[in-house]
Amino acid sequence: MATSDINSVVIVGRLTRDAELRYLNSGTAVASISIAVNRSKKDGDQWVSEANFFDVSYFGKGAEGIKPYLTKGTQIAVQGSLRQDRWEKDGQKFSRVNILADSVELLGSR
C-alpha cells in the first residue's frame, strides 16, 4: 500500500514588515506576509537565539479582513502548506519556498 504525501505546516512568529495586499486579475485578494521565527540553538555552553524568515501568501476574503491588523511586530500563527515557486530569468533558474496559508490567527502585538 502506498503512503500519501503530507504537506502541512504550522508556524508562529512576528511580522517583519506590514503585510501588503494586492488583487489578482480574478479579483481575489492576496496578502503577502513576511514573518520571523526565533529558534534556540546551543553554541558551546550557551543557548543563543537565531531568527528564520518565511514568506507567507494568504488568499481570499480572510486576507482582506485581517490585513489592517498585520503590522510589523505583530505575532501571528499560520497554518497552511509549502509551495515551491520556480522561474527562469535571463537564462538563470531560481526557486523559493513559500507558505500558502489556510488560516492566519492574531496572537498579539509587540
Q: What role is predicted for each listed range?
A:
Residues 1-110:
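Single-stranded nucleic acid-binding surfaces, predominantly the OB-fold ssDNA-binding core
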